[in-house]
């Protein structure tokens, strides 16, 4: 319970920081360049992340760092990357949502993904599926307009939109542009196949999914039943 309260406090702090930064946005990250995996590469500004209350693998030990280490360790004792069984692959898909907007789900998603990325033997893939209000893209400074929605719509390949960052073991799949039929895309067989592909292709990763609030959008309900079935 104490861990949960602490995380909620940090989430509230993030929201205050986002509000404060709306009139004076921080400068964007240093830049992007082509990466060997075929998609873009994003150079994250560590100072920018810290200003939003986001911890990075090289952060000094602090209350926030230790809280996310505890959550991460609990998850890792239950689900191990590299296990080829269907149940274990699907269990490494960790969906983070909230009841309403503004409750800190992106704060949790990003910090948890970076906590996994600090491990020596595993990696993290952070997937943004909040197409309506992507706080994640604001924090990371992602400018690309393509993402998972475009993959599902058949407009591009997964490898074209996966973003490799300058933080070791940490990749991002942005949301892409929203639209009236996003819930149908998320509930489709193509989404189930994409999740299965990601868990097979990235067997050494925990896949954190930053999901829209469940009481503000039908997207979360569409995504919840999607499990790795192949």
Show which residues each predicted segment covers:
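P-loop NTP-binding module
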Residues: 1-230
């Amino acid at each position: 319970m104490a861990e949960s309260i602490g995380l909620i406090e940090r989430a509230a702090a993030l929201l205050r920081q986002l509000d404060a930064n709306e009139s004076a946005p921080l400068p964007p990250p240093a830049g992007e360049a082509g990466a060997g995996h075929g998609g873009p590469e994003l150079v994250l500004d560590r100072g920018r992340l810290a200003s939003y209350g986001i911890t990075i693998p090289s952060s000094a030990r602090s209350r926030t760092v230790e809280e996310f280490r505890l959550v991460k360790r609990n998850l890792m004792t239950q689900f191990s990357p590299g296990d080829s069984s269907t149940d274990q692959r699907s269990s490494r898909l960790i969906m983070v949502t909230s009841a309403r907007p503004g409750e800190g789900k992106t704060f949790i998603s990003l910090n948890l993904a970076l906590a996994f990325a600090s491990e020596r033997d595993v990696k993290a893939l952070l997937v943004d599926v909040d197409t309506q209000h992507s706080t994640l893209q604001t924090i990371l400074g992602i400018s690309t307009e393509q993402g998972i929605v475009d993959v599902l719509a058949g407009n591009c390949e997964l490898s074209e939109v996966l973003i490799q960052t300058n933080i070791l073991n940490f990749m991002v799949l942005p949301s892409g542009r929203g639209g009236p039929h996003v819930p149908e895309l998320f509930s489709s067989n193509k989404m189930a196949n994409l999740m299965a592909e990601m868990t097979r292709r990235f067997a050494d990763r925990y896949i954190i999914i930053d999901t829209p609030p469940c009481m503000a959008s039908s997207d979360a309900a569409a995504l919840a039943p999607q499990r790795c079935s192949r």
